[in-house]
Amino acid sequence: MRGVVVLVGILGCIYSISQFLRNSVGVIAPNLASELDLSASQIGFLASAFFFAFAGAQIPLGIALDRYGPRRCMLFCAAVAVAGALIFAAAPSPGWLIAARILMGLGSSCYLMAPLALYARQFSPDRFATLVGFQIGLGSLGTLLATAPFAFAVAVLGWRASFVIIAAAMVVATLAIVLIVPKDDGSEADRSAESLRDSFAGTRDAIRTPSFWPVFLLQLTGYSSFVLVVGLWGGPYLTHVYGYSLTERGNMLLVAVVAQVIGSFLWGPSDRLFNSYKIPVLAGSLLTAGLMALAAIVGAFSPTGLLLWFIALGGMTAYLTVLIAHGKSLFPPKLVGRGLTLFNMATMGGVFLTQAATGLIIDLFPQVDGGYSVDAYRTVFAVQAICILLGSLAYLRSRDPRKQL
């Protein structure tokens, strides 16, 4: 039991660094826009470059997980992520920042799927959703660090020095993987004998799995709703609409992340509680759509209403833990790595599309006193609500393996 706790702790720790990197633009977006004279669409593209690279890496990552094993993939990706963080810290121009975000996205691409592939092979299926909850819950600590603690570090050290510290933390976590995570077993060695053509055929088989597309389409909108706010537009929204300072917006984003951390642990076992994947997933997705619609209608909340909205957003979007478990349950063991990474491609691809598109949407509105009006953000929330509802409608067609147990 102690070994399991240490293993999950180490994997959750390095995943938290990945989470920090992906969400780090949210707090410093106004700083980057001011320092480098970036428009909303440029900020959106800068943030989304991470997710574009992350999503693009998922198919080859799925093949690599099944051929070479989780441990080797994590060690390789760590080197790429460290390089990206250091380049971001030293970047002299927007082009270098984007290149660094791409490297960070590639380097961070395996730190959810590799641990989940490891859990799928070493633990019983009925515990998988709970382990997903712990992995995402621990990883969410990185998102937490990307809010108020990061705002404090930026105020004291600057954002460049802060990224050097993150690179050093990634190096330490990588050493822990070397020492703690078990070496990949012989099953990967057997799979490595298959041809590249066979590997891609396995990806094709995963795509053809019944209920793949309904789950895939909801994955496009689930996580992107949370990252849209905490990882990108939450900071500018709080600054432009409410006049929040760096520290104040960091604190409010922190509230949402804490709510998601707690929510991840609570949502994790809900599939067993209801003996269903679909019931909790649909509840979470529809409540998230409702929150986005509420923000689109209200525009500017009262201070108490704003706080409650951020708490609810963090808690409701944590249903992703059950959606991941539902996706995993669709595949036979030999396709788990490829199947999970295909769903992760949808998750991160959805973030890329959402962040890039909303940057273009916000740029359609004229700036007001150096910022954007509440109507710009209301439009963003409305578009996201519609996307979630469409994803939920598609998800209704999925089969629920839990109902067959």
Language model features: what each stretch is:
Residues 125, 134-183:
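Helix-loop-helix hairpin linking two adjacent transmembrane segments in secondary transporters
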Residues 184-216:
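Juxtamembrane intracellular "pre-TM" segments in multi-pass secondary transporters
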Residues 57-69, 263-276, 362:
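Helix-to-loop junctions at the C-terminal end of transmembrane segments
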Residues 67-78, 272-286:
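Cytoplasmic membrane-interface "Motif A"-like loop-to-helix N-cap segments
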Residues 56-95:
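Conserved MFS/SLC helix-loop-helix module at the cytosolic interface between two early adjacent transmembrane helices
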